[in-house]
């Protein structure tokens, strides 16, 4: 049995009366999870919808608590870190992390950035040692896979694409996830949403097909 951590980040739901208002990234991620559980019914799923339940932004007091040794933390500091501890525990349990995310202003939604800020934490998910020279940070966890399921209004954000340099979503997620022990990164994406034309329909169909192919590849 393996554990999957499924994280949705869109501000949109998937049950709107108007179909066009539904979140594409959430719908694709739900399709991934449905296909996975159909083939692996005994696997454990941990679910978080950050769009509906956004994590707290970190603060100066939070940072101070993080850099205070556990045995010296006040009760107030321990309380400040309760959410972070919970989220890190979920990451620690996960073999596979599935993150669905729209591209907002060419990057990740604020709720996803807030989640990363809560979980990428010194002495919990990474260590820092200047004896390592110019690369002092190393992850504590290892062996995890991450699937980013994304949607965007425009297109061409892939390597070599016409908007490659405008893509601050996938590269950011991939880079930050390394400090959560992620060693394999996959992305499935739907593009052209704002154009609402045949290209979007084809991209969305390809994304659904890509979901099914990736599930078969990973099981």
UniProtKB/Swiss-Prot annotation:
Which InterPro entries does the record match to this protein?
A: Flavodoxin_fold (IPR003680), Flavoprotein-like_sf (IPR029039), FMN-dep_NADH:Q_OxRdtase_AzoR1 (IPR050104), NADH:quinone_OxRdtase_FMN_depd (IPR023048)
Q: Among its keywords, does the record have Oxidoreductase?
A: yes
Record note on cofactor:
Binds 1 FMN per subunit.
Q: Which annotated residues bind FMN?
A: 10, 23-25
The cofactors it requires, by name, are:
FMN
Listed A to Z, the keywords are: Flavoprotein, FMN, NAD, Oxidoreductase
According to the UniProt entry, what is the EC number of this protein?
1.6.5.-, 1.7.1.17
| One Gene Ontology term of the molecular function aspect | FMN binding
Catalyzed reactions per annotation:
2 a quinone + NADH + H(+) = 2 a 1,4-benzosemiquinone + NAD(+); N,N-dimethyl-1,4-phenylenediamine + anthranilate + 2 NAD(+) = 2-(4-dimethylaminophenyl)diazenylbenzoate + 2 NADH + 2 H(+)
Q: Does the keyword Flavoprotein apply?
A: yes
- Which chain positions lie within coiled-coil regions? none
Broadest EC class? oxidoreductase
Task: Give a short account of what the protein does.
Answer: Quinone reductase that provides resistance to thiol-specific stress caused by electrophilic quinones.
- Summarize the subunit comment: Homodimer.
**Homology family:** Belongs to the azoreductase type 1 family.
- What's the protein here called? FMN-dependent NADH:quinone oxidoreductase 2
Organism per entry: Colwellia psychrerythraea (strain 34H / ATCC BAA-681) (Vibrio psychroerythus)
Q: Which gene encodes it?
A: azoR2
């Amino acid at each position: 049995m393996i554990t999957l951590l499924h994280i949705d980040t869109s501000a949109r739901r998937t049950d709107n009366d108007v179909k066009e208002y539904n979140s594409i990234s959430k719908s694709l991620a739900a399709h991934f999870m449905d296909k996975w559980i159909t083939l692996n019914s005994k696997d454990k799923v941990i679910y978080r919808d950050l769009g509906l339940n956004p994590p707290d932004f970190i603060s100066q007091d939070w940072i101070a608590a993080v850099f205070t040794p556990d045995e010296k933390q006040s009760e107030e500091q321990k309380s400040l870190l309760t959410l972070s501890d919970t989220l890190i525990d979920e990451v620690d349990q996960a073999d596979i992390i599935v993150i669905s995310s729209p591209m907002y202003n060419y990057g990740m939604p604020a709720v996803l950035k807030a989640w990363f800020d809560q979980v990428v934490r010194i002495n919990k998910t990474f260590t820092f040692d200047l004896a390592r020279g110019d690369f002092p940070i190393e992850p504590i966890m290892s062996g995890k896979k991450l699937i980013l399921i994304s949607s965007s209004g425009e297109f061409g954000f892939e390597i070599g694409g016409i908007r490659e340099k405008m893509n601050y979503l996938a590269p950011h997620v991939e880079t930050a996830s390394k400090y959560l022990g992620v060693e394999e990164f996959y992305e499935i994406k739907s593009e052209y949403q704002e154009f609402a034309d045949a290209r979007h329909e084809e991209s969305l169909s390809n994304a659904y097909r890509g979901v099914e192919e990736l599930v078969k590849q990973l099981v």
